[in-house]
Regions:
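Periplasmic/extracellular, small/polar-rich flexible segments of pilin-like filament-forming proteins
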Residues: 57-168
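Conserved hydrophobic/amphipathic alpha-helical signal-anchor segments
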Residues: 34-73
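Poly-acidic low-complexity segments
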Residues: 30-33, 37, 105
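N-terminal single-pass transmembrane signal-anchor helix
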Residues: 2-33
Length: 168
């Protein structure tokens, strides 16, 4: 009677092949998720630039906009445009965006906010610790609103998106 079974060497070869395939798969998966995070950060940035542009156009037409300006409150308020640009863009607009939909930092999903008030230097500071945040800044002394995002570490100049949206 002849037994049919795999030899120890054959089994070790199969285990080695599975290990190699798993290692290649993990590297490919990490590259895929890294690219997805960069793209999500870029999308958040682009959406914020579009929203700021839309708000400025609405202000130019009507002098006021409807926003859910209070954090965690879905009540829509009619807000006069630019009584204080910092409060208007960095408080009311950020609150409206969060109340309208969920914004996550792709690098810290579910842990903290993706939208932050502040200067573009904030996007580049912290040695990459601010990666994924969208920074919004409008000041009374400025004729524009700035939107900045670090899309990937180390948050060097080539990793920062910056848009200035001018207030007409």
């Amino acid at each position: 009677v002849k037994d049919k079974a795999f030899t120890l060497i054959e089994l070790l070869v199969v285990v080695a092949i599975i290990g190699i395939l798993a290692a290649v798969g993990v590297v490919a998966y990490n590259g895929y998720t890294g690219a997805a995070k960069v793209n999500a950060a870029k999308t958040n940035h682009t959406n914020m630039v579009k929203k700021v542009s839309l708000i400025i156009q609405q202000c130019n037409l009507d002098g006021s906009v409807s926003m859910m300006s209070k954090w965690g409150n879905k009540t829509v308020f009619n807000i006069n445009c630019y009584p204080n640009k910092f409060t208007f863009f960095s408080d009311y607009l950020i609150n409206d965006m969060y109340n309208s939909s969920r914004w996550d930092n792709p690098y810290r999903a579910g842990q903290n906010n993706a939208l932050q008030p502040g200067w573009c230097t904030n996007a580049a500071s912290g040695g990459g610790g601010n990666v994924g945040f969208v920074w919004i800044n409008g000041r009374d002394s400025m004729d524009h609103v700035t939107v900045c995002t670090c899309t990937k570490k180390p948050c060097g100049s080539s990793d920062i998106l910056e848009n200035k949206i001018y207030i007409d």
